[in-house]
Amino acid sequence: VLPIQTKEEQEILCSRCNVPFRVDALAYKALTDGEFCGICQFTMDHAGGKILDFSEAPGLYAFEPMFVMGRAALNFIDLCGVHRAFFDAEYPDENLIKSIGFSRNAEGRWEMDLTDFFKEPCKHSQK
């Protein structure tokens, strides 16, 4: 999992995953054996971090790189001092979303508290 360094690359990878290119979003790419397999676009503001797009390249689903990419985005959000995150992307695998650490709040939105989430031991075991 690597941060996408240029908006040009981000736009190309968004196109490969059939998600809208969001010029104001930060982005990570997931790789398996050096091959691109997914993208995550996210933002941060006073309300929290928001994963806006989370998608694998067509035909290239792999749980582990997608999981690591989700956690990498959350770790970056947390390191920036934002300790609440939302998963607002449309993604069909709820088990993966839960494994990353999200749970549905009272309004049905995927949410998580990042406070101390990445401290030893990592709170990787969610309900």
Regions found by a protein language model. Give the residues of each.
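C-terminal "cap" of GNAT-fold acetyltransferases
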Residues: A106-K127
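Conserved acyl-donor/pantetheine-binding loop and adjacent beta-alpha core of acyl/acetyltransferases
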Residues: R16-R22, Q41, D53, L114-T115
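Short glycine-aromatic motifs
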Residues: I4, A25, G101-S103
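Conserved donor-binding loop and adjoining core beta-sheet/short helix segment
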Residues: L26-E64
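Conserved GNAT acetyl-CoA-binding A-motif
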Residues: I77-E90
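Conserved active-site alpha-helix within GNAT-family acetyltransferase domains
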Residues: E90-G108
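Conserved acetyl-CoA-binding loop-helix of GNAT-fold acetyltransferases
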Residues: Y61-D78
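Short amphipathic alpha-helix that is part of the acyltransferase structural core
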Residues: V1-V23, P121-K127
